[in-house]
Amino acid sequence: MKQEILKNLPKIELHCHLDGSLSRPFIEKRLGRTVRPEELSVSENCTSLNEYLEKFDLPGRCIMDEDGLSGAAYDLLSQMNEENVCYAEIRFAPLLSETKKMDSRKVIEAVIRGMEQGKKDFGIEYGVIVCAMRHHSAEDNMRMIKTAREYLGSGVCAADLAGAEALYPMSEFMDIFTETKKMGMPFTLHAGECGNPQNIIDSINVGAGRIGHGIAMRGNQEIQKLAKKAGVGIEMCPISNLQTKSVNSMAEYPMREFLDAGLKVSVNTDNRTVSNTSLTKELEFVQNNYGIRDEEIFRMMKNAIDTAFTDDSIKEKICKMLK
């Protein structure tokens, strides 16, 4: 598929972090100064996840008040509109934006306001995914998820767990997400972005609807069978995973393997600005490097719709746009 066709294709994005995807003009406006591209995005020679994470400092400063949060949400939907994303689930960590004046309720409401304005102006259907952070206390994470649960179906669509997977394995968070499931809150979980496949097993067993990344089940047919049987979506973020060295080389990236195993793979950006990417660029990348056929692009969009945290009426609407 040519780039222009890919750009105009109606697209679905399920794994996109708000703070890692703010546009340079938005960040410059918020900071009141010119920002160099290298302050925001990693180069092709990114050496590690730590180098990658350094790029979140500036955008993080831009979302510490309600105007910044609302503006950030609108800014991201504006970017998505430029490449015909018709449904998007945007994730962020409310606790990272909390201040003495702004609790997680106000944080979540501010993001929803920006999303609603973006939906009104661009026609993009959206859902907000709230991220619990691995380094935060169980009490704080649970407090945030309980608050977010009040907005389920009114902007919020799911919860997530993000942060340093290597330091905090999934086994430490089973109680939180068992409780989240009891509350009727859907969730996706970052798991297998680094080398521990047990995190994927634990995530599936606790009831995750989707897995963020899932790279660690490469070559492991047993876990792949478990994921397939559970019907979980696999949110793959190719360019980001290569930059953070989740895999050592392009040849090791398991997109073709996962598709051939019948997993519900979707393609995502992860962090548009930090990775200097877009959904169009990601799709072009996987076609050029992994022999992804045109019909498989549509299959992955269908996988994204099938595993989206939204109601059937919106799924039907998006399906019609793809035909």
Model-derived segments and spans:
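Short HxH-centered metal-ligating active-site micro-motif
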Residues: H190
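Metal-cofactor-binding active-site regions of metalloenzymes
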Residues: M1-M185, C194-N199, N205, G209-R210, ...
